[in-house]
């Protein structure tokens, strides 16, 4: 086995997932209110990680239609990716990270993300063997998909705010300005 410093690093960004069977690879991501699900089959020696922004699906009326932002889509992709590479559903185990409350608003998207991930895995019959969710600071996450080892580092307030800026949905484009005026 390679030393920790020599591990092949694969960074996961929002809306992505990766499945690997390389014992010398480590998956990493930076999380604010987003959640990362880390799943593996310990017998097959394969695992993966996803990184989603919002719970639910892109079919809801307020979603904006980008499926890669949503937990339902990325959870299904991760599970199916593991199964395609030889994992068995009955051997999968999960760890959940992220879901911080990084923006003080009325709704806590981070909490909703974490609750969604836990409920999704419960519904799928996949045990959650570890989790670290909530709080008010982001985290850097590392996950070794073959061994199942995970490590997180808390982010400072400034690092969390930079992460939040990356997670926020871009503003809708401005509506075109009317060139004519009608008086009544």
From Swiss-Prot:
The name this protein goes by in its record: Probable chemoreceptor glutamine deamidase CheD
Biological processes annotated in GO: chemotaxis
A molecular function (GO) term: protein-glutamine glutaminase activity
Sequence similarity: Belongs to the CheD family.
Enzyme class, first EC level, given as a word: hydrolase
Catalytic activity: L-glutaminyl-[protein] + H2O = L-glutamyl-[protein] + NH4(+)
Function, in words: Probably deamidates glutamine residues to glutamate on methyl-accepting chemotaxis receptors (MCPs), playing an important role in chemotaxis.
Alphabetical list of SUPFAM superfamilies matching this protein: CNF1/YfiH-like putative cysteine hydrolases (SSF64438)
Organism field: Rhizobium leguminosarum bv. trifolii (strain WSM2304)
Pfam families assigned to the protein according to its UniProt record, in alphabetical order: CheD (PF03975)
UniProt keyword annotations, A-Z: Chemotaxis, Hydrolase
UniProt xrefs under InterPro entries: CheD-like_sf, Chemorcpt_Glu_NH3ase_CheD, Cytotoxic_necrot_fac-like_cat
Signal peptide: none
Entry EC number(s): 3.5.1.44
